[in-house]
């Protein structure tokens, strides 16, 4: 293979890996949020309010799982072009070991507390909206189309999280819970902007986007929401270790249980 062919193959491999990691993000985030439906985590709506967050969270979860289906399905077709073997969405969900998933660690922890759910959704949805907005300009028509569909839904995801951050921030006890949750998950935020070889190669070809360029807008969005909730971020966005993060297949202790639960839900029959 000549130099030009090798570069093209590297770009195609990176593009496939880029789509797969985004599919994994949406899959795990959607599953985690779906688990909260009927769990009692979301308080009943107050009399006279227009929002019932249980069904709204379920709507967001379904949207993320649809996005995951589109991305994983596309990743499988891209793999077929590279290897001659196509894996379906279900193959990619059920046929990979935990260390072959490339999702962000941010979306993995169990939702045992509403404050943790709200913080995670705020941080992730603000990132996802910036990411998919940028991807609408992808040189790949399929990815750009998936991104355009996502951008129609993601503002609702972000606004739902912001609204709940404001609601929890209004009470002293709930604001303390929100602050504790923020302290706990903040170390995972560096991975959102990790510019590894996959991201850089996908961005250089015009297929993807370098996550590092999303950081200023994300910080402005998150800082504004936290300020309105009478909170502040714990510190600067940390630098993620490229070899010890979800993008490298290194996951939290919760992930094996998450994956087992996700597969049970998708079991035939």
Positions of the model-derived regions?
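Acidic/His metal-coordination segments adjacent to aromatic residues that form catalytic metal sites
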Residues: 2-24, 93-120, 171, 185-207
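Hydrophobic packing residues in well-ordered alpha-helices of helical domains and bundles
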Residues: 19-22, 26, 57, 118, ...
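Helix-loop segments that flank and shape redox-cofactor active sites
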Residues: 29-59, 127-143
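A structural signal for well-ordered alpha-helices, especially hydrophobic packing surfaces
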Residues: 30, 37, 68, 72-75, ...
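Conserved alpha-helical segments that form or flank metal/cofactor-binding pockets of metalloenzymes
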Residues: 60-95, 161-164
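Internal, conserved structured core segments that host functional sites
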Residues: 104-159
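A contiguous pocket-lining binding segment that forms or flanks enzyme active sites
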Residues: 142-204
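Extended, helix-rich structural scaffolds rather than catalytic motifs
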Residues: 176-269
């Amino acid at each position: 293979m000549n130099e030009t062919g090798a570069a093209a193959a590297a770009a195609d491999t990176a593009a496939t890996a880029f789509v797969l990691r985004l599919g994994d993000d949406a899959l795990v985030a959607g599953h985690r949020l779906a688990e909260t439906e009927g769990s009692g985590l979301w308080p009943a709506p107050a009399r006279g309010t227009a929002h019932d967050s249980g069904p709204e969270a379920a709507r967001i979860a379904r949207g993320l799982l649809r996005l995951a289906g589109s991305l994983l399905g596309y990743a499988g077709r891209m793999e077929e072009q590279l290897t001659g073997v196509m894996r379906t969405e279900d193959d990619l969900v059920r046929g990979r070991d935990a260390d072959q998933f490339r999702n962000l660690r941010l979306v993995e922890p169990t939702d045992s507390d509403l404050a943790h759910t709200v913080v995670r959704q705020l941080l992730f949805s603000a990132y996802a909206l910036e990411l998919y907005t940028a991807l609408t300009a992808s040189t790949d028509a399929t990815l750009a189309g998936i991104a355009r569909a996502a951008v129609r839904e993601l503002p609702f995801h972000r606004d739902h999280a912001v609204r709940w951050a404001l609601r929890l921030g209004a009470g002293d006890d709930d604001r303390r819970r929100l602050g504790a949750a923020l302290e706990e998950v903040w170390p995972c935020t560096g991975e959102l902007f990790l510019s590894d070889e996959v991201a850089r190669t996908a961005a250089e070809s015009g297929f993807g986007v370098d996550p590092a360029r999303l950081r200023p807008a994300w910080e402005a969005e998150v800082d504004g929401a936290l300020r309105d909730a009478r909170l502040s971020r714990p510190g600067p966005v940390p630098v993620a270790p490229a070899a010890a993060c979800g993008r490298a297949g290194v996951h939290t202790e919760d992930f094996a249980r998450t994956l087992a639960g996700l597969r049970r839900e998708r079991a035939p029959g």
